[in-house]
Amino acid sequence: MTLHLKKVELHCHLEGAAPPELTAAQARKYGVDISGELRGGAYVWHDFASFLECYDKVSEVYRTEEDYARLTETYLDELAGINTIYSELIVSPDHGKRIGLGADAYISGICEGIRRAREKSGIEARLIVTGERHFGPESVIGAAEYAAKAGNPLITGFNLAGEERMGRVADYARAFDIARDAGLGLTIHAGEVCGAFSVADALDAVHPSRIGHGVRAVEDVDLVKRLADLGTVLEVCPGSNIALGVFPDFASHPLRRLKEAGVRVTISSDDPPFFHTSLAREYELAAEAFGFSDAEIDAMTRTAIEAAFVDEETRKALLARL
């Protein structure tokens, strides 16, 4: 129903996009038992805590620069196959350090995967470096400094992810100042696990152009108006929200309400195979579960390009491909 539509994704965690088949092959390669996390070709978890545990276990089987090149290439090839023209991948150099690969080799592998995929299909991709709240402000500042000093043209944004309930956004404001001063685009996870107040905190402390999720803003009518007035773009991931119980079903999900209130919204998949979804399915849901027309979906894709962390020449080229 929506395969013919051009697609753009602004919110996807790279390790969270690992296809189960590739993960199974990687586990065999390293002799790692992931039978508790991967059964019948699907990732297994039952609540947010076990999702994070499953995510970490899956990430363990990606260890080398080539592993990350292959993971990135595989995901971008999948996107290109459904008419996707642009993708932003959320990546963590800190994760590269923790697994002993190192931040530079981690990023280098990912960039090689982007190069391979683009050579085949023309898909464009950029990287958003993320700090993780649960490792504390100093770790997040380190991630921002890495992104700011990398001098890598594919690193164009900075994000804050991880456990939303760990501290207030103001605790991490210094990291965003560093990223902003380096000319990086700013986005932040808020309004997912925590309520509308976390979105307000993000606006007050960080002044981001985009917010990852942000859907709990619907709980505060004044905040919704503020988002609309500011033109802040929400990276909405409906399948993820339902899978994690942020909302009980698509009928209660606020994507359409937010759009009709004038908030700029886009569609993404977050950690697709973990939530039994894909970018293709998210676009299908936009049509079938939310009743958006092709023109309305195209408008959200256009919003995503307008909000993408790219140079103006690339933005014009992407808009011309719609």
Curated annotation (Swiss-Prot):
It is an enzyme of class 3 (hydrolase). Zn(2+) binds at residues 11, 13, 189, 270. It catalyses: adenine + H2O + H(+) = hypoxanthine + NH4(+). The active site is at residue 192. Binds 1 zinc ion per subunit. The record marks 213 as: Important for catalytic activity. Its cofactor is Zn(2+). GO terms for biological process: adenine catabolic process; hypoxanthine salvage; nucleotide metabolic process. Catalyzes the hydrolytic deamination of adenine to hypoxanthine. Plays an important role in the purine salvage pathway and in nitrogen catabolism. Belongs to the metallo-dependent hydrolases superfamily. Adenosine and AMP deaminases family. Adenine deaminase type 2 subfamily. NCBIfam families: aden_deam, PRK09358.1-3. This is Adenine deaminase.
